[in-house]
Amino acid sequence: MEFLLQLENILKKRKQDLPDKSYTADLFRGGVDRILKKVGEEAGEVIIAAKNSDKKELTHEAADLLFHLQVLLVEQELSLQDVVEELRKRHS
């Protein structure tokens, strides 16, 4: 879980700096529509991997989905902590 918080900080820096030759910066430059397209693609790949009962592929695709979801959260100025707090509300 700690790494997800580190990744969030990396993503915020990429959004701020928009370095050349950065996949993440390219996503931010493409705006919310490009990011949403990637989230949708990765969600579909997670579904297929799960349907195929392929744990290795599911792990890979879930990582891709989590990454792109974090990019979306940063783009929308939300944090993982915001999501965790919502989950806590639902389960308390």
Swiss-Prot record:
Pathway: Amino-acid biosynthesis; L-histidine biosynthesis; L-histidine from 5-phospho-alpha-D-ribose 1-diphosphate: step 2/9
SUPFAM superfamilies cross-referenced by the UniProt entry: all-alpha NTP pyrophosphatases (SSF101386)
Gene3D superfamilies tied to this protein: MazG-like
One GO cellular component, as annotated: cytoplasm
Localisation: Cytoplasm
EC main group: hydrolase
Biological process terms in GO annotation: L-histidine biosynthetic process
EC number: 3.6.1.31
InterPro entries, per database record: HisE, PRib-ATP_PPHydrolase-like
CDD domains: NTP-PPase_HisIE_like
Keywords associated with the record: Amino-acid biosynthesis, ATP-binding, Cytoplasm, Histidine biosynthesis, Hydrolase, Nucleotide-binding
Main location: cytoplasm
GO molecular function: ATP binding; phosphoribosyl-ATP diphosphatase activity
Catalysed reactions, as listed in the record: 1-(5-phospho-beta-D-ribosyl)-ATP + H2O = 1-(5-phospho-beta-D-ribosyl)-5'-AMP + diphosphate + H(+)
Pfam families: PRA-PH
Family that this chain belongs to: Belongs to the PRA-PH family.
Protein name according to UniProt: Phosphoribosyl-ATP pyrophosphatase
Organism of origin: Leptospira borgpetersenii serovar Hardjo-bovis (strain JB197)
